[in-house]
């Protein structure tokens, strides 16, 4: 039995004591798993080399904790679990926003670090893709969700578009469009599809030589919007969703357990364990992750992790298409495509500023339990829902009343004789209870679940009051 070069994560406990969901009955099974893997040949087959036990390289630790091991060429190496998908004590809810318009569309973007110890997302939002023809009439939007570092995601946001436009297929397509007044035909659409795939592969190959990439990887979803078509490239588990009046379209995630992905992974000498590649990586296609792409016998699109995207081409329907969302999996972890589309439609009836629509989505996902970085771009087309002025005014009046109740409650709390600003904390639950007691939970308004919590957090931060 063989193991690919891609690292395999194994959880093990320092002692058979309770660590969250890890208990005495489960710890022996984990140790047995580690023992079994230690007897395997790392590279090659038994005929290539004799199977020898893998040496264990421990990391010193004096405390009871969840411990993580990786199978490497040096043996079972214990690594610092704090740097692997670790979370903050409190989420960082500050947001980065951009917005713009052009070519008959509007867009807004919001990103938030959330519970993660660092921000690894990046994005592109260009209402005008380029100043040259035909791209001056096209738009380009993309989101890159990094893992094990932000390096490849940041590089993708600054260089991927250039790789697409400079591909041989895009140049040939450009020449053809100049000759036929920019009309996308079947042949030019095929060139677009090939150009996107080659551009992704080219970017990934060139990035391999960069010194700052380290072991980071990222998913990618990009959307080109032309006057007549959507052309979407997807790599990994970020997603694009196009919402119309009567239908919703969404890209398909690349997960190791899907049949077509599993076949490639197993063909490259890997396996799918706990729905991950070799028990470690949760996506089957990505930029970077070069330790999963080191078999010299295989082309890039047949490695354990492939950098080749799926490309979707859809004709636009100007009367039906309302908006498109391009977002990372921090959104889709807690919302289905349909739930997200319905939520965005609802918020568009209240907000004319698309940044506020995106902010509401991120805050709602946080309340629903998303623990990941979150980045979202919403692109509105001519048929998008318009603001309902009566709904907008009613919600604004309700928000004003809630703010008044929260501030009055905090005034009373801070004025208490035993309250010490530097030591005592106000709980969000106590604020929510106060709002409920005042009969302010909305019944006739479709206000998002997160609204009271978000308002309370903002007021507490503005007043510099500690809270939990």
Curated annotation (Swiss-Prot):
Gene behind the chain: ppm-1.A
Name under which the protein is recorded: Protein phosphatase ppm-1.A
GO molecular function: metal ion binding; protein serine/threonine phosphatase activity
Effects seen without this gene: Approximately 15 percent of mutants have an overextension of the axon of ALM neurons which terminates with a small hook. Approximately 30 percent of mutants have an overextension of the axon of PLM neurons. Approximately 10 percent of mutants lack synaptic branch extension in PLM neurons.
Residues binding Mn(2+) 2: 145, 329, 372
Cofactor binding note of this UniProt entry: Binds 2 magnesium or manganese ions per subunit.
Region (Disordered): 1-23
Listed EC numbers: 3.1.3.16
UniProt domain PPM-type phosphatase: residue ranges: 106-381
Organism: Caenorhabditis elegans
């Amino acid at each position: 039995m063989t193991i690919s070069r891609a690292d395999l994560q194994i959880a093990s406990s320092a002692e058979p004591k309770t660590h969250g969901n890890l208990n005495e009955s489960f710890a022996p099974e984990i140790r047995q798993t580690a023992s079994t893997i230690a007897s395997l040949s790392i590279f090659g087959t038994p005929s290539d080399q004799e199977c020898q036990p893998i040496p264990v390289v421990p990391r010193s630790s004096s405390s009871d904790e969840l411990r993580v091991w990786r199978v490497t060429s040096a043996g079972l190496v214990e690594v610092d679990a704090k740097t692997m998908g670790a979370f903050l004590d409190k989420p960082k809810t500050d947001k980065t926003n951009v917005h713009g318009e052009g070519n008959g569309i509007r867009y807004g973007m919001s990103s938030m670090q959330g519970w993660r110890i660092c921000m690894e997302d990046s994005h592109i939002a260009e209402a005008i893709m380029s100043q040259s023809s035909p791209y001056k009439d096209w738009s380009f939007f993309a989101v890159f969700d990094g893992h094990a570092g932000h390096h490849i995601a940041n590089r993708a946001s600054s260089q991927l578009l250039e790789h697409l436009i400079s591909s041989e297929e895009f140049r040939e397509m450009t020449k053809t469009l100049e000759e036929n007044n920019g009309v996308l035909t079947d042949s030019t659409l095929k060139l677009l599809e090939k150009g996107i795939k080659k551009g992704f592969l080219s970017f990934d190959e060139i990035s391999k030589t960069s010194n700052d990439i380290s072991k980071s990887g990222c998913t990618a979803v990009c959307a080109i919007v032309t006057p007549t078509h959507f052309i979407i490239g997807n790599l990994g588990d970020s997603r694009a969703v196009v919402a119309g009046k009567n239908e919703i379209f969404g890209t398909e995630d690349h997960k190791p357990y899907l049949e077509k992905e599993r076949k490639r992974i197993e063909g490259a000498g890997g396996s799918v364990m706990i729905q991950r590649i070799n028990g470690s990586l949760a996506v089957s296609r990505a930029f970077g992750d070069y330790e999963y792409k080191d078999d010299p016998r295989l082309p890039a699109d047949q490695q354990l992790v492939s950098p080749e995207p799926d490309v979707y081409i859809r004709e636009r329907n100007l009367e039906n298409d309302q908006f498109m969302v391009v977002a990372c999996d921090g959104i889709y972890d807690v919302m289905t495509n349909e739930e997200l589309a319905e939520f965005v439609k609802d918020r568009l009836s209240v907000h004319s500023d698309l940044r506020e629509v995106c902010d509401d989505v991120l805050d709602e996902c946080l309340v629903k339990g998303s623990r990941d970085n979150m980045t979202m771009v919403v692109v509105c087309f001519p048929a998008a829902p318009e603001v309902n002025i009566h709904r907008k005014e009613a919600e604004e009046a309700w928000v004003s009343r809630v703010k008044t109740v929260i501030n009055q409650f905090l005034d009373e709390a801070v004025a208490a004789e035993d309250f010490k600003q530097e030591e005592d904390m106000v709980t969000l639950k106590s604020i929510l209870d106060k709002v409920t007691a005042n009969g302010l939970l909305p019944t006739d308004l479709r206000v998002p679940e997160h609204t009271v919590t978000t308002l309370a957090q903002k007021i507490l931060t503005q007043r510099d009051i500690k809270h939990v």
